[in-house]
Amino acid sequence: LKSTIIMNEHSLDNVTKTKTYLNGVDAPDRSKSIVGGLSGTVFKLPDVNSGYPVAKLIDESGAEVEDFQRGDGYPDTRSHRLKLGVLVPATNCMVESEMWDIIVRNRELLSGVGIHATNILTPAPKFGNAEELENYKTVFNANLVEAAETALLAEPQYLIVAFSMEHFYSDLDENASQPRLVEQSTGLSAATWSKAADAALKKFGARRIGLLCPFDPRGLENAIGFFENLGYEVASAAGLGCASGTDVGHVPDAYKEKVIHERFVPVDIDAIVVCGTNLASLALAEKLEQKLDIPIIGINPALLWYALRENGISAPLLGASRLF
């Protein structure tokens, strides 16, 4: 699963180009081309270090004592291995929490990996019925690319689109259309739920799945259709009918566990899939996977897993669900 670095005219071994970094410095561009560890596709890993830092030592009188010698550049002190930009709906409180839980539990193995979140403005976060869902889709899509462009201010190397696009779209091409605009606008590759869910289910050889979503009937119908279009059989599906993005984050784990036992355990399934980035699933997976002997693929752990594996970080992790 390790990624391959393709040495080319932008690589560390043969720097022939420069670029202007956000601090205004013109410096070498040591970008690399990567073959994704899961997708096998080639994408660019940009150089976000060679132009940094511009700094100088100043004494108590305000006099400049010396310039910091940048040399070939220095990496971000905390995200020196991989800097991930994460696009998160403004109502969401679970994405960063679950991803940081995984990173903190595996401090040594993920040292130098950082996530840097940018909110997608969703001023009309209600989606309790078909009309509200359509309005929510319009607002979300209108603000997604702007959020991605804002995320570039942190100079990320790779993006994660932390959203369940199947809430809106069952068609595979429509589902990929908005994340594709993000990649085109930023020039960065992105982990999406459609990519991560498919790769995760393939890892377990799953065909029949149980689907847990926070959606209303229209959203649940879209989600079922999406996974069927990916080639999976949805043996059982449960929507929680949450009225808004904020409501999703307040559904207690005990209730989700009840739904899993009542709706999925009696059914012959290969995996449980949890959609909705504000519907926390990591603690449930850690509690139930071994007991039920069924993998629980939650969107937030799966998105981080996909981003790490695509970028060649393949070590098994603890406290992160069976997926890792």
Model regions and ranges:
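N-terminal glycine-rich phosphate/adenylate-binding segment common to multiple enzyme folds
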Residues: 140-188, 192-195, 274-282
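C-terminal functional extensions of proteins
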Residues: 298-324
